[in-house]
Amino acid sequence: MIKQRTLKNEIRATGVGLHTGQKVYLTLLPAPVDAGIVFRRVDLNPVVEIPAKAANVGDTTLSTTLIQDGVRVSTVEHLLSAMAGLGIDNAIIEVSADEVPIMDGSAGPFVFLIQSAGIVEQNAAKKFIRIKKPITVQDGDKSASFLPFEGFKVSFTIDFDHPVFRGRKLDATVDFSSTSFVKEVSRARTFGFMHEIEYLRSKGLAKGGSVDNAIVVDKFRILNEDGLRYEDEFVKHKILDAIGDLYLLGTSLIGEYKAYKSGHGLNNKSLLELIKQEDAWEMVTFEDDEVAPISYIKPLLAV
């Protein structure tokens, strides 16, 4: 049986919020079977819990923000991407502010935290949503589709009219039956344009943003001294974001997600459309590991 997973131990980290620039304390804790991923604002009294579900997405400007009764947790996508990539079904995420720390702008530090905490299987079947028929959502020239596929695959195309992107690979497909999330996707950093960062700062945002936690691009070039971590790091980060946004389904996905110029808004819009069209998917579990289209390496190997 493919079983649900949680963390073995509690683990803590600190970082800065991308927008506030303030120090944020982060704690990842184990959670019981079927709890899902739940964010907990421990700086509030009483403490507020927000389940990581698509219906709780209240803002997709610049990042994915969960909102419940006016309480927010922003920039959840990179941490959720790490949870999805390592197959964590149940966890409590405590934060001391209204945003998850940006760390280095990728999911890499979160992968390291989860692996350091350890991963344990729980005595219940892992749930998957399997796509049965195609669904496409358009937004102007942008599009996002869910397609039937026996496995999990994300295909993404970006399009920027900018010198840095000319001659670069602007599309990528990652089939997770043959590609390691940890090695090939998790280290891709978020990117931003200098003029946008300056504008955001004038509005009191992006105070924590720097070359330490993003790929920063000016009119002509990449400003980071060390350059890129992958040749196709830009589009790989979009795939990383999509994996995190899709994990707001509350389960792992069996199917393909194909996106053209999509962002957090369209990722969420397509997810809500999928949930609404109940004949387009089915919930499945696997009693027999051998017949499962997605193989999850035994947790011990992930440590």
Curated annotation (Swiss-Prot):
Signal peptide: none
Any one of the GO BP annotations: lipid A biosynthetic process
Cofactors, names only: Zn(2+)
Pfam family name, one: LpxC
Active-site residues, as the UniProt record annotates them: H264
Binding site for Zn(2+): H78, H237, D241
Top-level taxon of origin: Bacteria
InterPro entries: Ribosomal_Su5_D2-typ_SF (IPR020568), UDP-acyl_GlcNac_deAcase (IPR004463), UDP-acyl_GlcNac_deAcase_C (IPR011334), UDP-acyl_N-AcGlcN_deAcase_N (IPR015870)
SUPFAM superfamilies recorded: Ribosomal protein S5 domain 2-like (SSF54211)
Keyword Lipid metabolism: yes
UniProt-recorded Gene Ontology molecular function terms: metal ion binding; UDP-3-O-acyl-N-acetylglucosamine deacetylase activity
Record EC number: 3.5.1.108
Keywords, ordered alphabetically: Hydrolase, Lipid A biosynthesis, Lipid biosynthesis, Lipid metabolism, Metal-binding, Zinc
Pathway the protein takes part in: Glycolipid biosynthesis; lipid IV(A) biosynthesis; lipid IV(A) from (3R)-3-hydroxytetradecanoyl-[acyl-carrier-protein] and UDP-N-acetyl-alpha-D-glucosamine: step 2/6
Keyword Metal-binding: yes
Reaction equations catalysed: a UDP-3-O-[(3R)-3-hydroxyacyl]-N-acetyl-alpha-D-glucosamine + H2O = a UDP-3-O-[(3R)-3-hydroxyacyl]-alpha-D-glucosamine + acetate
One GO cellular component term noted in the UniProt record for this chain: membrane
HAMAP family the UniProt entry points to: LpxC (MF_00388)
Reported function: Catalyzes the hydrolysis of UDP-3-O-myristoyl-N-acetylglucosamine to form UDP-3-O-myristoylglucosamine and acetate, the committed step in lipid A biosynthesis.
NCBIfam families listed in its UniProt record: lpxC (TIGR00325)
Family: Belongs to the LpxC family.
Name of the protein described by the UniProt record: UDP-3-O-acyl-N-acetylglucosamine deacetylase
Naturally occurring in which organism (per UniProt): Saccharophagus degradans (strain 2-40 / ATCC 43961 / DSM 17024)
